[in-house]
Amino acid sequence: MDVTLLKVTAILYLLASASFVVYVFLVRDSVANLSPVLLFAGFAVHTAALGVHFLQTGYPGIAQFREALSFYAWLLVAGYLLIQLKYRLAILGAIIGPLAFLMTLAAFAFGTGGGELPPGLKTYWLPVHVTLAFLGNAIFALAFGVSLMYLFQENYLKRKKMTSVMKRFPSLEALDKLNYVLLVWGFPLMTLGILTGSVWAGIHWGNYWSWDPRQISSGIAWLFYAAILHGRITAGLRGKKAALLTMVGFAVVIGYFLLGDSIFPSRHGGRFE
Protein backbone atom coordinates (compact mmCIF):
# COMPACT_ATOMS: atom_id res chain seq x y z
CA MET A 1 0.00 0.00 0.00
CA ASP A 2 1.30 3.46 -0.92
CA VAL A 3 3.19 4.76 2.12
CA THR A 4 2.94 8.44 1.19
CA LEU A 5 -0.82 8.31 0.71
CA LEU A 6 -1.29 6.49 3.99
CA LYS A 7 0.85 9.06 5.79
CA VAL A 8 -1.26 11.87 4.35
CA THR A 9 -4.39 9.96 5.36
CA ALA A 10 -3.17 9.58 8.94
CA ILE A 11 -2.26 13.28 9.15
CA LEU A 12 -5.68 14.35 7.87
CA TYR A 13 -7.45 11.99 10.28
CA LEU A 14 -5.36 13.44 13.12
CA LEU A 15 -6.19 17.02 12.11
CA ALA A 16 -9.87 16.10 11.82
CA SER A 17 -9.77 14.49 15.27
CA ALA A 18 -8.22 17.61 16.80
CA SER A 19 -10.79 19.76 15.07
CA PHE A 20 -13.66 17.63 16.39
CA VAL A 21 -12.27 17.84 19.93
CA VAL A 22 -12.00 21.63 19.68
CA TYR A 23 -15.57 21.82 18.36
CA VAL A 24 -17.05 19.59 21.07
CA PHE A 25 -15.08 20.30 24.22
CA LEU A 26 -13.92 23.87 23.65
CA VAL A 27 -17.26 24.81 22.08
CA ARG A 28 -15.84 26.50 19.01
CA ASP A 29 -18.57 26.80 16.38
CA SER A 30 -16.02 28.21 13.94
CA VAL A 31 -14.66 24.70 13.28
CA ALA A 32 -18.08 23.03 13.00
CA ASN A 33 -17.82 22.71 9.22
CA LEU A 34 -14.05 22.23 9.09
CA SER A 35 -14.05 18.94 11.02
CA PRO A 36 -16.15 16.86 8.57
CA VAL A 37 -14.30 18.43 5.63
CA LEU A 38 -10.93 17.32 7.02
CA LEU A 39 -12.28 13.85 7.68
CA PHE A 40 -13.69 13.66 4.15
CA ALA A 41 -10.33 14.78 2.75
CA GLY A 42 -8.64 11.99 4.70
CA PHE A 43 -11.24 9.55 3.40
CA ALA A 44 -10.59 10.65 -0.19
CA VAL A 45 -6.83 10.15 0.15
CA HIS A 46 -7.44 6.83 1.91
CA THR A 47 -9.64 5.74 -1.00
CA ALA A 48 -6.83 6.63 -3.39
CA ALA A 49 -4.38 4.56 -1.31
CA LEU A 50 -6.68 1.53 -1.50
CA GLY A 51 -7.10 2.06 -5.23
CA VAL A 52 -3.34 2.28 -5.83
CA HIS A 53 -2.85 -0.91 -3.81
CA PHE A 54 -5.37 -2.74 -6.01
CA LEU A 55 -3.74 -1.51 -9.22
CA GLN A 56 -0.27 -2.51 -8.00
CA THR A 57 -1.13 -5.95 -6.59
CA GLY A 58 -4.27 -7.00 -8.44
CA TYR A 59 -6.19 -7.70 -5.23
CA PRO A 60 -7.99 -5.48 -2.68
CA GLY A 61 -6.07 -4.42 0.41
CA ILE A 62 -7.87 -6.70 2.88
CA ALA A 63 -5.83 -9.92 2.93
CA GLN A 64 -3.26 -9.15 5.64
CA PHE A 65 -3.84 -7.81 9.13
CA ARG A 66 -2.28 -4.40 8.45
CA GLU A 67 -4.42 -4.10 5.33
CA ALA A 68 -7.50 -5.14 7.30
CA LEU A 69 -6.85 -2.40 9.86
CA SER A 70 -6.63 0.20 7.11
CA PHE A 71 -9.75 -1.10 5.36
CA TYR A 72 -11.67 -1.16 8.64
CA ALA A 73 -10.74 2.48 9.31
CA TRP A 74 -11.84 3.40 5.78
CA LEU A 75 -15.26 1.78 6.23
CA LEU A 76 -15.64 3.40 9.64
CA VAL A 77 -15.05 6.87 8.22
CA ALA A 78 -17.36 6.16 5.27
CA GLY A 79 -20.12 5.14 7.68
CA TYR A 80 -19.63 8.24 9.81
CA LEU A 81 -19.73 10.55 6.78
CA LEU A 82 -23.08 9.02 5.76
CA ILE A 83 -24.43 9.54 9.27
CA GLN A 84 -23.16 13.12 9.28
CA LEU A 85 -24.83 13.73 5.93
CA LYS A 86 -28.21 12.49 7.19
CA TYR A 87 -28.22 13.32 10.91
CA ARG A 88 -25.67 16.16 11.23
CA LEU A 89 -24.10 14.38 14.19
CA ALA A 90 -20.72 16.12 14.27
CA ILE A 91 -20.06 15.11 17.87
CA LEU A 92 -19.79 11.46 16.82
CA GLY A 93 -16.71 12.48 14.85
CA ALA A 94 -14.93 13.13 18.15
CA ILE A 95 -15.05 9.34 18.65
CA ILE A 96 -14.74 8.05 15.09
CA GLY A 97 -11.97 10.43 14.00
CA PRO A 98 -9.45 9.38 16.68
CA LEU A 99 -10.40 5.73 16.23
CA ALA A 100 -9.77 5.90 12.47
CA PHE A 101 -6.46 7.69 13.09
CA LEU A 102 -5.29 5.07 15.60
CA MET A 103 -6.24 2.19 13.30
CA THR A 104 -4.43 3.79 10.36
CA LEU A 105 -1.41 4.45 12.56
CA ALA A 106 -1.48 0.86 13.83
CA ALA A 107 -1.39 -0.37 10.23
CA PHE A 108 2.05 1.28 9.94
CA ALA A 109 3.25 -0.65 12.99
CA PHE A 110 2.79 -3.88 11.06
CA GLY A 111 4.69 -2.59 8.02
CA THR A 112 3.48 -1.30 4.69
CA GLY A 113 5.10 -3.68 2.26
CA GLY A 114 3.01 -6.04 0.18
CA GLY A 115 3.35 -9.76 -0.13
CA GLU A 116 2.29 -12.62 -2.34
CA LEU A 117 -1.35 -13.49 -1.82
CA PRO A 118 -1.73 -17.06 -0.44
CA PRO A 119 -3.30 -19.43 -3.01
CA GLY A 120 -6.36 -19.98 -0.83
CA LEU A 121 -7.15 -16.26 -0.94
CA LYS A 122 -6.97 -15.92 -4.72
CA THR A 123 -10.72 -16.07 -5.17
CA TYR A 124 -13.63 -13.67 -5.55
CA TRP A 125 -14.88 -14.93 -2.17
CA LEU A 126 -12.17 -12.84 -0.49
CA PRO A 127 -13.61 -9.38 -1.27
CA VAL A 128 -17.21 -10.59 -0.97
CA HIS A 129 -16.84 -12.25 2.45
CA VAL A 130 -14.46 -9.72 3.99
CA THR A 131 -16.35 -6.66 2.75
CA LEU A 132 -19.68 -7.92 4.11
CA ALA A 133 -18.17 -8.91 7.45
CA PHE A 134 -16.25 -5.66 7.81
CA LEU A 135 -19.26 -3.57 6.82
CA GLY A 136 -21.26 -5.19 9.59
CA ASN A 137 -18.45 -4.67 12.10
CA ALA A 138 -17.94 -1.05 11.04
CA ILE A 139 -21.63 -0.33 11.59
CA PHE A 140 -21.40 -1.99 15.01
CA ALA A 141 -18.44 0.30 15.76
CA LEU A 142 -20.64 3.29 14.91
CA ALA A 143 -23.35 1.86 17.18
CA PHE A 144 -20.70 1.59 19.89
CA GLY A 145 -19.87 5.28 19.47
CA VAL A 146 -23.55 6.26 19.61
CA SER A 147 -24.03 4.09 22.72
CA LEU A 148 -21.04 5.74 24.38
CA MET A 149 -22.58 9.14 23.67
CA TYR A 150 -25.88 7.96 25.13
CA LEU A 151 -24.28 6.80 28.38
CA PHE A 152 -22.21 9.97 28.64
CA GLN A 153 -25.25 12.20 28.26
CA GLU A 154 -27.47 10.03 30.46
CA ASN A 155 -24.91 10.24 33.24
CA TYR A 156 -24.76 14.02 33.02
CA LEU A 157 -28.54 14.38 33.00
CA LYS A 158 -28.89 12.00 35.93
CA ARG A 159 -26.48 14.13 37.95
CA LYS A 160 -28.27 17.25 36.72
CA LYS A 161 -24.93 18.58 35.61
CA MET A 162 -25.36 20.66 32.49
CA THR A 163 -22.33 21.99 30.65
CA SER A 164 -21.75 23.69 27.32
CA VAL A 165 -20.59 20.34 25.93
CA MET A 166 -24.08 18.92 26.37
CA LYS A 167 -25.39 21.37 23.80
CA ARG A 168 -23.58 19.30 21.18
CA PHE A 169 -25.55 16.16 22.00
CA PRO A 170 -28.86 15.19 20.41
CA SER A 171 -31.62 13.93 22.70
CA LEU A 172 -31.37 10.55 24.41
CA GLU A 173 -34.35 9.40 22.38
CA ALA A 174 -32.62 10.33 19.11
CA LEU A 175 -29.43 8.50 20.13
CA ASP A 176 -31.38 5.41 21.15
CA LYS A 177 -33.23 5.41 17.84
CA LEU A 178 -29.99 5.78 15.86
CA ASN A 179 -28.45 2.93 17.86
CA TYR A 180 -31.37 0.72 16.84
CA VAL A 181 -31.13 1.76 13.18
CA LEU A 182 -27.42 0.89 13.12
CA LEU A 183 -28.06 -2.52 14.69
CA VAL A 184 -30.78 -3.21 12.13
CA TRP A 185 -28.31 -2.46 9.31
CA GLY A 186 -25.28 -4.12 10.86
CA PHE A 187 -26.86 -7.43 11.81
CA PRO A 188 -27.89 -8.57 8.28
CA LEU A 189 -24.45 -7.63 6.96
CA MET A 190 -22.78 -9.61 9.74
CA THR A 191 -25.08 -12.54 8.92
CA LEU A 192 -24.17 -12.40 5.23
CA GLY A 193 -20.50 -12.18 6.18
CA ILE A 194 -20.78 -15.37 8.24
CA LEU A 195 -22.78 -17.17 5.55
CA THR A 196 -20.37 -16.29 2.74
CA GLY A 197 -17.48 -17.31 4.98
CA SER A 198 -19.13 -20.68 5.60
CA VAL A 199 -19.71 -21.24 1.89
CA TRP A 200 -16.11 -20.31 1.15
CA ALA A 201 -14.91 -22.67 3.88
CA GLY A 202 -17.02 -25.45 2.39
CA ILE A 203 -15.50 -24.90 -1.03
CA HIS A 204 -11.91 -24.62 0.20
CA TRP A 205 -11.81 -26.97 3.21
CA GLY A 206 -14.63 -29.36 2.38
CA ASN A 207 -16.84 -28.47 5.35
CA TYR A 208 -18.94 -25.43 6.12
CA TRP A 209 -18.31 -25.43 9.87
CA SER A 210 -15.13 -26.77 11.44
CA TRP A 211 -15.30 -25.17 14.91
CA ASP A 212 -12.47 -22.87 13.94
CA PRO A 213 -11.92 -20.23 16.68
CA ARG A 214 -12.87 -17.46 14.27
CA GLN A 215 -16.11 -19.24 13.39
CA ILE A 216 -16.92 -19.80 17.06
CA SER A 217 -16.28 -16.17 18.01
CA SER A 218 -18.37 -14.97 15.06
CA GLY A 219 -21.18 -17.30 16.07
CA ILE A 220 -21.11 -16.02 19.66
CA ALA A 221 -21.14 -12.39 18.49
CA TRP A 222 -24.01 -13.15 16.09
CA LEU A 223 -26.09 -14.74 18.86
CA PHE A 224 -25.37 -11.80 21.15
CA TYR A 225 -26.48 -9.19 18.62
CA ALA A 226 -29.49 -11.33 17.68
CA ALA A 227 -30.50 -11.34 21.35
CA ILE A 228 -30.16 -7.54 21.53
CA LEU A 229 -32.33 -7.04 18.46
CA HIS A 230 -34.87 -9.57 19.70
CA GLY A 231 -35.03 -7.73 23.00
CA ARG A 232 -35.49 -4.38 21.29
CA ILE A 233 -38.22 -5.66 18.99
CA THR A 234 -40.20 -7.86 21.37
CA ALA A 235 -39.30 -6.92 24.95
CA GLY A 236 -38.93 -3.16 24.81
CA LEU A 237 -35.18 -3.20 25.39
CA ARG A 238 -33.91 0.35 24.98
CA GLY A 239 -32.06 3.15 26.65
CA LYS A 240 -29.16 2.51 28.98
CA LYS A 241 -29.42 -1.29 28.94
CA ALA A 242 -29.47 -1.40 25.14
CA ALA A 243 -26.48 0.94 24.99
CA LEU A 244 -24.48 -1.15 27.46
CA LEU A 245 -25.24 -4.40 25.64
CA THR A 246 -24.31 -2.83 22.30
CA MET A 247 -20.95 -1.80 23.71
CA VAL A 248 -20.32 -5.27 25.15
CA GLY A 249 -21.13 -6.85 21.79
CA PHE A 250 -18.68 -4.62 19.97
CA ALA A 251 -16.02 -5.26 22.61
CA VAL A 252 -16.28 -8.97 21.80
CA VAL A 253 -16.05 -8.32 18.05
CA ILE A 254 -13.12 -5.89 18.14
CA GLY A 255 -11.33 -7.83 20.87
CA TYR A 256 -11.18 -10.97 18.79
CA PHE A 257 -10.36 -9.03 15.64
CA LEU A 258 -7.30 -7.48 17.28
CA LEU A 259 -6.12 -10.32 19.53
CA GLY A 260 -7.97 -13.50 18.65
CA ASP A 261 -5.65 -15.01 16.06
CA SER A 262 -2.59 -14.44 18.24
CA ILE A 263 -4.24 -16.20 21.20
CA PHE A 264 -6.26 -18.87 19.41
CA PRO A 265 -4.54 -20.22 16.25
CA SER A 266 -6.96 -20.05 13.36
CA ARG A 267 -7.04 -20.72 9.64
CA HIS A 268 -8.04 -17.11 9.18
CA GLY A 269 -5.72 -14.13 8.97
CA GLY A 270 -4.11 -15.24 5.73
CA ARG A 271 -3.37 -18.77 6.93
CA PHE A 272 -5.48 -20.49 4.32
CA GLU A 273 -3.52 -23.67 3.80
Where are these regions (language model features)?
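Polytopic transmembrane helical bundles with strong interfacial aromatic enrichment
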Residues: M1-E273
